[in-house]
Each structure stands twice: as C-alpha cells, then as structure tokens.
C-alpha cells in the first residue's frame, strides 16, 4: 500500500508533506547508498566508551583521607565492600560487550567473610537446605556459620573464599527434592555484632579459659572460631569488639605481659590507643596472619616496651623487599625489640655516650614536709565530710574573718557550660572590661565565702581520686592544693532515685591556711572546676566498686570514741606545728560532731577503755559502720572482718590492708 505523501518509499523522495514534491532520480543517490551501508556496518561494530565521573568534579576530590577509608572499611553492613557483580544487570551501555558468563567473579575482601543468601528458602529446614548445597558442591564441603532465617530468605556466612566462590557459581544446579532451585547469591559481608553485657560476659569467660597465669600470656588467636563463641560472632578486627576485649584485660589482668592476636583479620590498631597506660607490662605481641597494611598503624604501640613482635603474613611485611630495611623500620618504632617474627635480632650498634640523669619519678602527691601529711589528711577528711553534708554553714569556723574565695572555670567552648557554677565564674580572660567586673565575683569575708559555697548543688567527693601537693608547711602557714573528682547530684534531694543522676566534675582547690588566735583557719582559697574527661569518667565509675585503702587508719593510730574524735579531730594533729600550747582548731568540734557521728580519720572507735571482744552492741555497730566507711566494704563483710579479729579494730584494719594488697578480698565484699 503506497504511503501518504507520494511514492511507495521516501528513499528517493525528499517530500515530507502530504502532497507531491520535487522528483529526484534514483541514480542521484548512488553515492548515498554506499555511505549508508558503510555507516550501518560501522554501527554494528562493538565499541567501548567511558562515562565521565559524576561526583569527582575537581582533582582535589580524588585524594581521600586515611580516616575516611578506615571508616568505610569498618562499615557495619559492609555495603561498600561488596565486590561481586550483580546476578542480573539491569542496564548496559549500547555497544558494550555482553558478559559471557551469568555470574561475575567474587573478589576476596580484606576481612575474609562472605554472606550467602537463599531467597524464599525460609520455609525449609536447615538440614534440607544444607544437604542440597553439599550435594551440588560435591566432592567439596564447607561449614556454614551464623545461620539465621529472615522474613523471606535464609542467610549464612563463611570465611572460606573458595567455598563462597563455588556457592556463587552453583546457579540452577542446586535444587531441593521438590524441584525448588536454590539460586544462592554471594557477596562480601560480615555477621551482625551487638555488644551488650551478655556479649562481654561470654568474651570474658572465653578469655579466662585462654589465659595462662604462669606466663601471664593471653592467646586470642582466631578468637572468633572458639567453640565457646559458636552462637555469637566475635570479630577482633572490629574496633568496638577489640576495645571491649582490651577493657576486659585492663579490668581483670592488668599485669598482662604477652598477647597473641594471630589470624584475626586485624587491619587497624585504633583500639590500642592509650594501651601503655592500661596494659603497661605488655612486652610480647603476636600480630601474624592479619591485614595490617603498613607499619604506621603500629605507632599507637610506640610507648610500650615491646621485646618480641610477630608481623609475618601481613601486607606491611610484603611492602619491603629488603628484610634488613623492614627490620630497621620496625626497630625505629620499637628500639628495645629483641625478637622479630621468631628470629632473634642482632644487637644494635650504639655509641658509648654518658647516660644522662633521669627525670624524677612522678607521684600522685608532693609533700614538702612529711610531717604535714597527717595534718592535711585530717583536714581534708573533716572539711569534705561537712562540705558534702546538707549543712555547709558549719564551715564558717573554718574560714578567716577576711578570707577571700575565687572560683573559675574554662570557657564553654572548651569544657561545656557548667550551669550550676557559671554565675560564680571569675575567669579573667572572660572579664576584660573594667576593674569592677574582675572583682565582682571575688568573695571577701567569711560569710560571703561560705554563702557562695552553700549555693552550690549537693556534691559527693570521691576520696579515691584525690591528689595533694603540700608546697609550704611551717609555723606561719601551710599551702596545699587538692585535685580530684566529685559528683554533682540532682537538686531533687527528696527523691531517692535522684541520687543516681549525677554529672562527674573535676576540681582543683588551693588553700592558704594561717594561724588565728589559738588555731588555724583558711585565709585564701581558689577553686577551678571543669567537666571530667571520658577517661576520668570511666576510671571514676570503675573505682566505685573498689576500696580506698589509703583511708584506713594505721595500726599505730590512737583510737578514741566518735565523740572524742569529733571534738579533737585535727586539733591534736596541729599541735605538732608548735604554734599553740592549747587545743588548735581549723574546724570547731561542735559542727563536726553534729554532721559526722563517725570519724573516718585515724580516730574512730575506742579500744583503750574497753577490752577487745567486750564491747556492747551499740559500740559494735559503730565499729562496723566505721570499718565499712573506711574500707568501702559492705556491712556484712565489715562485721565478718571484726568478728574474726575478736573486735580489735586496729588488728582488723591491719588484716584488711594486708589481704587487699594481696587481692584476696572477693569483689562481693564491696557491693553495697
């Protein structure tokens, strides 16, 4: 049927309308036919073209930071690590060659784990599916791990690359007895990891089984494959899992000397930051058969005195063709290294230089005069017991009539806004305009100082975290600085649950104590407050279940009644200064007796007037409370300690200190 517009074909007619047009002879198009055939011939040829990048618009974008790469490598669902080609490509550029096979090659990943998915197989039993897979792969076998059934599929994992590749190429060959074809899909992936208390407890039990107490060595090689962890996936190559393992080591075996981490697919050592403080005795470290890409990852271990190191079968080892160069680079990071990859190293050539004097050993506290240690300890005990009580007005007798108090804290951008203390802030970098602003928050006078402290929220200081520097101690004055942590408690004091809601703060308080009449009092005090660091908070929470043996009285201490201890307290100790012949007081006896019925200093319970074992029941209860307060043991274990020593308080304190140093007191003794 002829087409509209004239003629049976428009090949020789340029008319594009409905009517006739100019006629062109066929011989005029001979050259056109030749060119048209050539174009069709060229179009049938396969060609390869490249798309321009959609996201890299600038050469600077090509360079990726190492931390970005590490974050992508540790992605939870491993979506960016999938290297297998999709089973059914949804699109292909015209002219690109068609893949010959149905499945792409499964590329090995750095973690060595692969996820197998069986779509719509959730209605079948595990034995049925596994038998069909093994029959299709015969004579090859594999062991599926972490099998789980999802809503519309079955998922399991394998750490055998060859087995994963064979499963991927099964295609339609694997089928069930009813004819259903499995069609497994394989991609890179790792099992899910949920770190909770139950998970950590299983890790702890398994690690205890692998610890050698004689050699202080812990073997965590191929830890995820331990039979005790069969039901959970515990990959040490994940930073959070390795961090949990290091926490367990730090809490239970801080004296660890040898650690074996062979064959765990570890590619990053970020979890080992600060390990020199947490495991200071670590000297032997095995990291063989892992995925450590370069020696730069071992910088976090540079502060450890590593004597033996294993790095065989790691990418960082293969980067050096010259073994001597590799040894030299490792020794630059670990100068004390003696053995590397099982081979003893030759001694390094060093110059015989005269050894320089070493720095003095750091200590928690500094005392310019040891005679002032007991005085300061008594002062802190009484002062902070009143400070943490409900009535801080009792501190009036502790301050001089012309005492001065200054409170400061860092800027909000550095430490966060400390709302409860911010109005007292006298940070001079913040108050630059005018003398009035700089002196407005300087408290002058006894009443102003105590009133300011009374406006603080309720606090609870932790004596275990205290450090003391006594810089001046003579007959004219004593100057000392106290640092530590305290809890800022919730203002709802009537609600018992509010006692558990608190923020941890760090403080530094400097006192200038001078003689006044027949006693001593605080002449000047400066206070610095800031938020506690994450490490300080972690150590603070850990110390809540540990005793404070430093608060225990010495066996040679005189022991008096609670009332006498409250009245005397610091006064008797201050007589050693030789300033006053009569009683000397920083704090008066009455407010202390009213706020602290049991003295936690060296004077606690009388044993001079009453023979051991002959106390009445009320005295025994006071002794139990004093023992519990000083040792941090609960009431039951405090009573047991006193009963076994025939209610001799000094002997009970001596026995407690001895057993505590030997780690023979069970943890339940400190659970209240």
UniProtKB/Swiss-Prot annotation:
Cellular component GO terms, alphabetical: cytoplasm; nuclear envelope; nuclear membrane; nucleoplasm; nucleus
Domain of life (superkingdom): Eukaryota
- Spans of the LRR repeats are 255-280, 281-304, 305-332, 333-360
Q: Could you tell me which SUPFAM superfamilies the record lists for this protein?
A: L domain-like, NTF2-like, RNA-binding domain, RBD, UBA-like
Stretches of the chain forming a coiled coil according to its record: none
Where is the NTF2 domain positioned along the sequence? 375-529
- UniProt biased composition (Polar residues): 553-563
PROSITE patterns associated with the record? LRR (PS51450), NTF2_DOMAIN (PS50177), TAP_C (PS51281)
Under Pfam families, the record lists: LRR_NXF1-5, NXF_NTF2, Tap-RNA_bind, TAP_C
Tissue specificity remark: Expressed ubiquitously.
Q: Which Gene3D superfamilies match?
A: 3.10.450.50, 3.30.70.330, DNA helicase RuvA subunit, C-terminal domain, Ribonuclease Inhibitor
Q: Which residues form the RRM domain?
A: 113-193
Show the segment(s) annotated as Disordered. Answer: 1-52, 73-101, 541-564
The residue ranges of the TAP-C domain are 618-672
Phosphoserine modification sites? 561
Q: Which UniProt keywords apply?
A: Cytoplasm, Leucine-rich repeat, mRNA transport, Nucleus, Phosphoprotein, Repeat, RNA-binding, Transport
* Record's subcellular location: Nucleus, Nucleoplasm; Cytoplasm; Nucleus envelope
Q: What is its main location?
A: nucleus
Mind telling me which CDD domains this protein's record contains? Answer: NTF2, UBA_TAP-C
Cite the record's note on assembly: Interacts with Nxt1. Interacts with ZC3H3. Forms a complex with Nup358/RanBP2, RanGAP and Nxt1. Interacts with Nup54 and Nup58. Interacts with Orc3 and Hpr1.
| Additional detail | Mutations affect the morphogenesis of embryonic neurons, embryonic muscle and adult sensory bristles. This is thought to be due to reduced rate of protein synthesis as the mRNA is not efficiently being exported out of the nucleus.
The similarity comment for this entry is:
Belongs to the NXF family.
Role this protein plays:
Mediates the export of the majority of mRNAs from the nucleus to the cytoplasm. In ovarian follicle cells, plays a role in transposable element silencing regulation by enabling the nuclear export of flamenco (flam) transcripts and subsequent piRNA biogenesis.
Q: What is known of its domains?
A: The leucine-rich repeats and the NTF2-domain are essential for the export of mRNA from the nucleus. The C-terminal fragment, containing the TAP domain (also called UBA-like domain) and part of the NTF2-like domain, named the NPC-binding domain, mediates direct interactions with nucleoporin-FG-repeats and is necessary and sufficient for localization of NXF1 to the nuclear rim.
The name on file for this protein is Nuclear RNA export factor 1
Organism of origin is: Drosophila melanogaster (Fruit fly)
Per the record, the gene is: sbr
